[in-house]
Amino acid sequence: NVTSSQPKLTITGTTRKVAAGKKTKLQVKTSSGVVNPSNLIWTSSNKKVATVNSSGVVTFKKKTGGKSVVITATLKNNRNAKATYKLTATKNPVTKITISGKKTMKINKSQRLKAKVSGKSGAYKTVKWTSSNNKYATVTSKGQVKALKAGKGKTVTITASALDGSGKKARFKIKLK
């Protein structure tokens, strides 16, 4: 009495909101890691709103703001193994990001950087924060930077990237003392 279990697929992405006319990349994971896109069949619930290519890149058509689409990934060798991911188009993209904060920090101290995100009404203004070197300074999803001992005397760059597919980002250099 042998029962075969379906591999559990999960689609991951950096966002669920993408500006109309822009794109985002999705990945499929199983318990054993990331699935090679060539082993998947990607489909869009509405090609008039957004298309998806064989690499998992979803491209929203222009003037689709407010509309949603469900992207499905199916394993080529097991059509019963599939996952879905809902995305919504925003009317306008992010046009600019500026970061404010202190340009120098002492080791073991923290500061919260502020990202001013500009865009017309309806833009998705959430950003992803990253550090150029997590051994020198870390940054949380809220922009909280902590200077680490290994970074003493170094300079680190903190980046705030728009998640809406606009490609907009801002960089902020901090000297660690």
Model-inferred region functions:
Residues N1-K177:
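Extracytoplasmic soluble-region selector
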